[in-house]
């Protein structure tokens, strides 16, 4: 019964201790209580954790290295056994070959065993001390929580309004006991952790010095065995010197090793860094070619567009000759065929484009060509006005009524200048044709006729570019 009571009391005490520790940690995380900290110990604990991680990694790699040595030992032993099996007893060096194979096996056994003892076992002993230190650090953390809990409990009793001396005395006793345990453990760890952290250097030096010495001895002894094996093979070669070792079926030059020369680009293509200059020079004057009157424009020009005639770069193009009245009439008729009577024309000074199927030529959009066109049309209009003035002065008298009166004149008798530019009828009729003023604004449309007089053909400015605004086109 006494043992049962003592066991129950110990269990209750442990439960109470765990509960008080959990409560203290929660209060510390919430900021209700102050946690005791030791910066020197925290730095030593961090170094210990780093040292432990490095040691575990090195031990893992050393274990893999020793395992590879075991695999190499087994492979070397199998190769030696196979060589002894295929080596005929009649061949020279049969006895020496068996001795070399036995020495090779013993050398591998010694190297493997010493690596395990002087490197792997030493690293295991080095890591074994980490377990005890790790547990003591965890114990120190628990004692720190007990110390903080006892201190906070004592402060709460001392700051209470109604003080109980018995409880205060008991709390002071618990606080002193927790303080002694914590400070003693904390002092020991603060002394041992820096020493343990510095011992890693001596451990690394010892391990790798042992590995270097073992490898040096192993390679020296293995070099002697390799020399002996080479001499045995030399004796066998002299014994059977008539036998020649030839590898057949291997070409001297493989296609996979030949690098073909880079393919040069064809000469017909221009250089990718230079763009061809398709535009004519700015100084050359070009005159657009008008479509043939009375012929189908679609036969010569695809998609209803007339291309300008070819011109040599840099060669000036002559302007158009002075136009006669008959030529002006034929030109106006062809222009009426191109433009149409009821269609609105969108004439942009930057884009001289026509609608599909109109058959009007599309002129090059260059400043030099536009300037030449304006000068040419101005000269044509001036010569036409002079010709009409001379014809009016010499061909018709002011009082002659036979040629102008009576309303017998037909549409075909109207002169090109009068029909196109809205001049007054020669018979003094009150019917007048509303003329179209050619203004420098290219986008304006010509107004239709108001009375029964024949409608003058519309000027397609896309075929004939706008004239110079300085020209006056009033009829004489």
Swiss-Prot record:
Residues 340-353 have a biased composition (Basic and acidic residues). One of its GO terms (cellular component) is cytoplasm. Residues 26-242 form the BAR domain. Residues 269-369, 395-476 are annotated as: Disordered. Residues 310-324 have a biased composition (Pro residues). Residues 279-292, 461-476 have a biased composition (Polar residues). GO terms for biological process: phagocytosis, engulfment; plasma membrane tubulation; podosome assembly. It is found in: Cytoplasm. Keywords: Coiled coil, Cytoplasm. InterPro entries: AH/BAR_dom_sf (IPR027267), Amphiphysin (IPR003005), BAR_Bin2 (IPR046984), BAR_dom (IPR004148). GO terms for molecular function: phospholipid binding. Pfam families: BAR. Residues 325-339 have a biased composition (Low complexity). The keyword Flavoprotein does not apply. PANTHER family: AMPHIPHYSIN, BRIDGING INTEGRATOR 2. This is Bridging integrator 2. It comes from Gallus gallus (Chicken). The lineage of its organism: Eukaryota, Metazoa, Chordata, Craniata, Vertebrata. The gene is BIN2.
């Amino acid at each position: 019964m006494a043992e049962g009571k003592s066991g129950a009391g110990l269990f209750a005490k442990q439960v109470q201790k765990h509960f008080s520790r959990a409560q203290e940690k929660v209060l510390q995380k919430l900021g209700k209580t102050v946690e005791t900290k030791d910066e020197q110990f925290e730095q030593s604990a961090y170094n210990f954790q780093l040292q432990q991680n490095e040691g575990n990694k090195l031990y893992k790699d050393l274990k893999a290295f020793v395992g590879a040595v075991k695999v190499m030992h087994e492979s070397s032993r199998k190769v030696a056994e196979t060589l002894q099996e295929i080596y005929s007893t009649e061949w020279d060096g049969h006895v020496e070959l068996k001795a070399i194979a036995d020495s090779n096996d013993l050398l591998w056994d010694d190297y493997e065993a010493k690596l395990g003892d002087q490197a792997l076992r030493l690293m295991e002993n080095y890591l074994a001390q980490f377990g005890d230190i790790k547990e003591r650090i965890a114990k120190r953390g628990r004692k720190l929580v007990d110390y903080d809990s006892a201190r906070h409990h004592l402060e709460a009793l001392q700051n209470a309004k109604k003080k109980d001396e018995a409880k205060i005395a008991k709390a002071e006793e618990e606080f002193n006991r927790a303080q002694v345990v914590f400070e003693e453990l904390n002092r020991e760890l603060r002394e041992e952790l820096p020493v343990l952290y510095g011992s890693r250097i001596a451990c690394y030096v010892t391990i790798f010095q042992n590995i270097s010495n073992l490898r040096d001895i192993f390679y020296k002894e293995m070099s002697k065995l390799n020399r002996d094996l080479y001499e045995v093979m030399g004796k066998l070669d002299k014994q059977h010197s008539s036998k020649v070792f030839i590898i057949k079926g291997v070409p001297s030059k493989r296609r996979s090793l030949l690098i073909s020369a880079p393919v040069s680009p064809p000469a017909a293509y221009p250089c990718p860094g230079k763009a061809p200059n398709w535009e004519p020079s700015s100084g050359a004057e070009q005159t657009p070619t008008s479509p043939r009157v009375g012929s189908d424009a679609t036969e010569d020009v695809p998609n209803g567009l007339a291309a300008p005639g070819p011109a040599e770069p840099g060669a000036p193009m002559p302007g158009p000759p002075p136009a006669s009245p008959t030529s002006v009439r034929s030109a106006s008729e062809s222009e009426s065929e191109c433009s149409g009577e009821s269609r609105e024309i969108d004439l942009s000074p930057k884009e001289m484009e026509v609608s599909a199927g109109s058959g009007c030529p599309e002129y090059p959009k260059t400043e030099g060509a536009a300037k030449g066109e304006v000068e040419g049309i101005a000269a044509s209009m001036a010569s036409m006005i002079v010709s009409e003035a001379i014809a009016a002065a010499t061909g018709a008298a002011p009082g002659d009524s036979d040629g102008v009166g009576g309303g017998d004149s037909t549409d075909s008798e109207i002169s090109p200048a009068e029909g196109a530019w809205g001049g007054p009828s020669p018979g003094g009729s009150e019917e007048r044709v509303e003329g179209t003023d050619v203004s420098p604004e290219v986008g304006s449309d010509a107004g239709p006729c108001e009375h029964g007089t024949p409608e003058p053909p519309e000027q397609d400015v896309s075929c004939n570019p706008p004239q110079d605004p300085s020209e006056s086109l009033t009829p004489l």
